[in-house]
């Protein structure tokens, strides 16, 4: 089993460090800031094998150059777009193997937040950057609502116990909006209480799971009548399909 270590960065970013349980080798996901990563690498005497980049936004890649400068390892970088000279470009359904074959991660192209956005996953772990958050999803900056809807819908098809490692601690704010959409959702009400306790104690709310998100995340619930009814009431018009519902939901959240 691999250990996933949470590294906090900036105000609400999460950088993920995946450590091989049988060695000092590790992988880093979305290192927006090098300083907190280097601290852990030095404290635990870790060797970096690879850096995985979900997309090109600076708060996800800003620490790469400093990490490469500070470490002697021959670190491979994986991304959809050529962001650094050392990048190895990945595409849909590519399989990446690490730690002498003990860890495999597949690539899923999930454009919407950005056009180059990818997720890295297996049946147990999902590193989804800014595509899916706990209780929400990313803003659509470069893609279309249709692309984002397809992206989160594909993620929702992963096994329900898949742990969701997104890149930001947005959960509490997302749940305020989710409660606005489904105020009587019992699973959501329970989760709001759990998240409140964790945040009061300074604990992260991530990882979530796919199963939980399907119960509480309105962006994965666009076929639920409660969500449709709320949006139709808000807009004063009928929504005829899940994509229309998702698009209306994302626009509502953008101005919430």
Swiss-Prot record:
<dbReference type="InterPro" id="IPR035680">
    <property type="entry name" value="Clx_II_MBL"/>
</dbReference>
<comment type="similarity">
    <text>Belongs to the metallo-beta-lactamase superfamily. Glyoxalase II family.</text>
</comment>
<dbReference type="InterPro" id="IPR017782">
    <property type="entry name" value="Hydroxyacylglutathione_Hdrlase"/>
</dbReference>
<feature type="binding site">
    <location>
        <position position="55"/>
    </location>
    <ligand>
        <name>Zn(2+) 1</name>
    </ligand>
</feature>
<feature type="binding site">
    <location>
        <position position="59"/>
    </location>
    <ligand>
        <name>Zn(2+) 2</name>
    </ligand>
</feature>
<dbReference type="InterPro" id="IPR050110">
    <property type="entry name" value="Glyoxalase_II_hydrolase"/>
</dbReference>
<dbReference type="GO" id="GO:0004416">
    <property type="term" value="F:hydroxyacylglutathione hydrolase activity"/>
</dbReference>
<feature type="binding site">
    <location>
        <position position="130"/>
    </location>
    <ligand>
        <name>Zn(2+) 2</name>
    </ligand>
</feature>
<keyword id="KW-0862">Zinc</keyword>
<feature type="binding site">
    <location>
        <position position="168"/>
    </location>
    <ligand>
        <name>Zn(2+) 2</name>
    </ligand>
</feature>
<feature type="binding site">
    <location>
        <position position="57"/>
    </location>
    <ligand>
        <name>Zn(2+) 1</name>
    </ligand>
</feature>
<dbReference type="Pfam" id="PF16123">
    <property type="entry name" value="HAGH_C"/>
</dbReference>
<comment type="subunit">
    <text>Monomer.</text>
</comment>
<comment type="pathway">
    <text>Secondary metabolite metabolism; methylglyoxal degradation; (R)-lactate from methylglyoxal: step 2/2.</text>
</comment>
<dbReference type="InterPro" id="IPR036866">
    <property type="entry name" value="RibonucZ/Hydroxyglut_hydro"/>
</dbReference>
<dbReference type="InterPro" id="IPR032282">
    <property type="entry name" value="HAGH_C"/>
</dbReference>
<protein>
    <recommendedName>
        <fullName>Hydroxyacylglutathione hydrolase</fullName>
        <ecNumber>3.1.2.6</ecNumber>
    </recommendedName>
</protein>
<feature type="binding site">
    <location>
        <position position="130"/>
    </location>
    <ligand>
        <name>Zn(2+) 1</name>
    </ligand>
</feature>
<feature type="binding site">
    <location>
        <position position="113"/>
    </location>
    <ligand>
        <name>Zn(2+) 1</name>
    </ligand>
</feature>
<keyword id="KW-0479">Metal-binding</keyword>
<dbReference type="GO" id="GO:0019243">
    <property type="term" value="P:methylglyoxal catabolic process to D-lactate via S-lactoyl-glutathione"/>
</dbReference>
<keyword id="KW-0378">Hydrolase</keyword>
<dbReference type="InterPro" id="IPR001279">
    <property type="entry name" value="Metallo-B-lactamas"/>
</dbReference>
<dbReference type="GO" id="GO:0046872">
    <property type="term" value="F:metal ion binding"/>
</dbReference>
<comment type="function">
    <text>Thiolesterase that catalyzes the hydrolysis of S-D-lactoyl-glutathione to form glutathione and D-lactic acid.</text>
</comment>
<dbReference type="Pfam" id="PF00753">
    <property type="entry name" value="Lactamase_B"/>
</dbReference>
<feature type="binding site">
    <location>
        <position position="60"/>
    </location>
    <ligand>
        <name>Zn(2+) 2</name>
    </ligand>
</feature>
């Amino acid at each position: 089993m691999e250990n996933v270590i949470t590294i906090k960065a900036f105000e609400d970013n999460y950088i993920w460090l995946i450590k091989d349980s049988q060695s000092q080798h590790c992988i880093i996901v979305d290192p927006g800031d090098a300083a907190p990563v280097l601290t852990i690498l030095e404290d635990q005497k870790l060797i970096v094998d690879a850096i995985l980049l979900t997309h090109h936004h600076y708060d996800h890649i800003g620490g790469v150059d400093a990490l490469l400068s500070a470490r002697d390892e021959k670190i491979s970088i994986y991304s959809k777009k050529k962001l650094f000279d050392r990048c190895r470009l990945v595409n849909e359904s590519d399989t990446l193997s690490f730690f002498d074959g003990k860890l495999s991660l597949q690539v899923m192209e999930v454009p919407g937040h950005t056009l180059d956005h990818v997720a890295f996953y297996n049946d147990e772990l999902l590193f989804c950057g800014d595509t899916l958050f706990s209780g929400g999803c990313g803003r659509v900056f470069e893609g279309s609502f249709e692309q984002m809807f397809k992206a989160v819908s594909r993620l929702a098809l992963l096994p329900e116990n898949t742990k969701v490692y997104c890149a930001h601690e947005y959960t509490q704010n997302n749940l305020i909006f989710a409660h606005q959409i489904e105020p009587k959702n019992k699973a959501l009400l329970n989760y709001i209480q759990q998240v409140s306790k964790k945040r009061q104690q300074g604990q992260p709310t991530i990882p979530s799971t796919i199963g939980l998100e399907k119960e509480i995340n309105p962006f994965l619930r666009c076929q639920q009548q409660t969500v449709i009814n709320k949006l139709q009431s808000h807009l004063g018009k009928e929504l005829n399909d899940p994509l229309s519902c998702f698009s209306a939901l994302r626009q509502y959240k953008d101005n919430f």
